[in-house]
A protein has these predicted regions:
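Hydrophobic alpha-helical segments of membrane proteins
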Residues: 69, 73, 102-110, 140-144, ...
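Hydrophobic, glycine/alanine-rich multi-pass transmembrane helices and their short helix-loop junctions
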Residues: 79-80, 169-226, 230
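Interfacial helix-loop-helix hairpins and adjacent transmembrane helices
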Residues: 214-257
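Hydrophobic transmembrane alpha-helices
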Residues: 77-80, 98, 117-141, 181-184, ...
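Helix-loop junctions and hydrophobic alpha-helical segments within the transmembrane domains
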Residues: 152-173
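Membrane-water interface of transmembrane alpha-helices in multipass transporters/channels
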Residues: 85-95, 114-130, 188-204, 216
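Helix-loop junctions at the membrane interface of multi-pass solute transporters
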Residues: 143-155
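Structured non-transmembrane domains adjacent to transmembrane bundles in polytopic membrane proteins
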Residues: 1-89, 93-114, 120, 256
Length: 257
């Protein structure tokens, strides 16, 4: 069915496609129409409609991801490098954040498709989930690895890693669980994109907190050893006295004969 609306300034040609608006065939039709219109000399026309809007949204989201993802990772690498004074540790920690995002988004896609019955994932969800997970993952990385460096200088690499995990594990795990529950509440909203963002971020935080930060990062740190902190030397200073040692009374010397 074709409808033509004319005015002195413009003409509108309305066409109903035989394919479903969200089908690949409809997308191919829109692309073909745009190519035909662009090939006409002096033509000044636009191809719109639901399929065209969805196509432009997808392309815009993909363009944003190609710019934002590398830019965010470069900024994170620079910040971690300045804080940790290392080249290897920031690369490793940034890689674990990317792994957390990829795993959580893959798991979320399965939930959206086979549990919730969604037709697909909104194009804005990957960008939102990536920004949230990178920001939160970097915070936990800084907490853990800053303490790991301090403890390694006092007690050696293996013992320092164990102590840093024991000292920061409760805080990181508690914060991660609370934050995951907060984002999980978004899944109760009757808005698909909010549901998808909430589930993706909540799963990512739980994976990052319970698996990556608690198991993967300490294990990789022990495997890499002192190269983790290259090129800064990881010197070992004597352990600082504990508060219990400071409060312990000094032994009185034996009385002289």
């Amino acid at each position: 069915m074709t409808t033509i609306n004319e005015s002195p300034q413009w003409n509108e040609l309305s066409v109903v496609l035989t394919s479903a608006p969200d089908s690949p065939a409809a997308t191919a039709t829109i692309e073909a129409l745009r190519a035909r219109v662009a090939a006409v000399p002096g033509a000044d026309a636009l191809v719109g409609g639901p399929t065209a809007i969805a196509l432009d949204t997808d392309r815009g989201a993909a363009h944003d991801r190609r710019i934002v993802f590398p830019l965010v990772l470069l900024v994170v690498l620079a910040v971690l490098g300045l804080l940790l004074r290392s080249l290897i540790a920031p690369v490793l920690l940034t890689a674990t954040v990317v792994v957390s995002f990829a795993a959580s988004f893959g798991l979320s896609a399965l939930i959206f498709r086979y549990v919730l019955g969604f037709a697909g994932t909104d194009q804005g969800v990957p960008l939102y989930a990536f920004i949230f997970l990178v920001a939160l993952g970097v915070d936990y990385n800084i907490f853990l690895m800053s303490r790991a460096r301090e403890e390694a200088q006092r007690h050696g690499l293996a013992e320092g890693t164990r102590r840093s995990l024991a000292l920061t594990g409760t805080v990181i795990t508690s914060a991660g669980v609370v934050l995951a529950a907060t984002f999980g509440v978004l899944a109760l909203l009757p808005i698909v994109i909010m549901t998808e963002v909430g589930i993706s971020v909540a799963l990512g935080i739980l994976l990052d907190t319970l698996v990556v930060r608690s198991i993967l990062v300490p294990a990789l740190s022990l495997d890499i050893g002192r190269w983790m902190w290259w090129p800064a030397p990881l010197g070992k200073s004597p352990p600082e006295p504990m508060p219990s040692d400071l409060k312990r009374p000094l032994a009185t010397p034996p009385a002289g004969r």
